[in-house]
From Swiss-Prot:
This is Transaldolase. The keyword ATP-binding does not apply. It comes from the Bacteria. Its main location: cytoplasm. One of its GO terms (cellular component) is cytosol.
Amino acid sequence: MSNKLAQLRKLTTVVADTGEIDAIKKYQPEDATTNPSLILKAAQIAEYAPLIDQAIAYAKTQSNDKAQQVQDTCDMLAVNIGKEILKTIPGRISTEVDARLSYDTERSVAKARQLVKMYNDAGISNDRILIKLASTWEGIRAAEILEKEGINCNLTLLFSFAQARACAEAGVFLISPFVGRIMDWYKAKEGRDFAASEDPGVLSVTKIYNYYKEHGYKTVVMGASFRNIGEILELAGCDRLTIAPSLLAELEAAEGELVAKLVDSKGSKARPAPMTHSEFLWEHNLDAMAVEKLAEGIRNFAVDQGKLEAMIAAKL
């Protein structure tokens, strides 16, 4: 019998949640996802130094203003890392818009267009890129605009059913509902561990997946943020799962039969009327975990973006 990673690949598209080329080469995922924290981590690897130097050189041709140079370097570095990753995978790279723009639709759209242009100028077509945006109301509206322009989006930091519903109604290409961070919140609140089948994060993704399939939404569900392989195995059959290298290694070492837990019902239930802004805010607000985790996630990504900018500024 093959290992559980090999079996999972037959049920689900496996995505690598890393910016590290060596790990991607080793596990040969279909797609890869990055975020500000992963870009910061990757930027500290020696082999990435030329990518930073190249990004700095580019930024200096764009502006004489140091603050603008820092911004342009960070954007080009994310694209440079994305370009390197695309050499080793057949599918798409997800590159994230600055988390500090999470509540600004207009600036999120502008930043997304800029990142896509950088990829396009390097000869990379839109069908190999996903733009990551936080699943705020403003981020979802930005994605709605971008999707109509042929720029596919990955809506991240998704914790509530309200966020998932709004994303589907906006016609976004893909969502990344977080599993482990949901479990973290309930574990801290209730002071107990959860079996994988009862894991609140697993139950959240399962509910979203079934709702999408029952109502015929095309938005791809990509479970993210895993704490253990038990969570992953409980979501076997999900459209996609983005998994850190350490957990890919555990899956590769695990034996035993793996069965699909999520199955596409191919339903055609009538869809409800799209949520209004006020309905979205109220429904999301009713979920204390989601409110806290969305805000925390945006803050943490912004902190790591700031650290990256400080690192870049010191090199300019």
